Curated annotation (Swiss-Prot):
NCBIfam families: rpsG_bact. GO terms for molecular function: rRNA binding; structural constituent of ribosome. HAMAP family: Ribosomal_uS7_B (MF_00480_B). It comes from Angiopteris evecta. Keywords: Chloroplast, Plastid, Ribonucleoprotein, Ribosomal protein, RNA-binding, rRNA-binding. GO terms for biological process: translation. Its main location: plastid. It is found in: Plastid, Chloroplast. GO terms for cellular component: chloroplast; small ribosomal subunit. The gene is rps7-A. It comes from the Eukaryota. This is Small ribosomal subunit protein uS7cz/uS7cy. The keyword 4Fe-4S does not apply.
Amino acid sequence: MSRRSTAAGETAKSDPIYRNRLVNMLVNRLLKDGKKSLAYRILYQAMKQIKQKTQKNPLSVLRQAVRRVTPNVAVKARRVGGSTYQVPVEIIPAQGKALAIRWLLGASRKRPGRSMALKSSYELMDAAKNNGSAVRKKEETHRMAEANKAFAHFR
């Protein structure tokens, strides 16, 4: 048996303004070429835009959006006997949240327009209202899992 102590789990840092780990996760996914200050600036502009448009706390809108986009199940490709099956698997909450953030930012990037701050603010507001591309992606994933429920025993 090893005598060394186990390493302490690294906790995610929270952002300077909202002191929220979810915001920090979003910034880290938004990050390009190591330009974190730019990512923070984009996200804070988006939050300001949300506050102006909805007159609500932007953090609660963000939480609501992530909650609405977070999937419970996903499909994984599993090769059995020469054919590939889409096998539905349950997702742990942390992985679901990471997927939701990825989908939200992907949908924001695909929106028409110039400013990423504007595009992401509109996508977050849409997701909080339960519509938008990211929510459609989640529903599509759930439909795929439902359609391939017969292959669940291949896990």
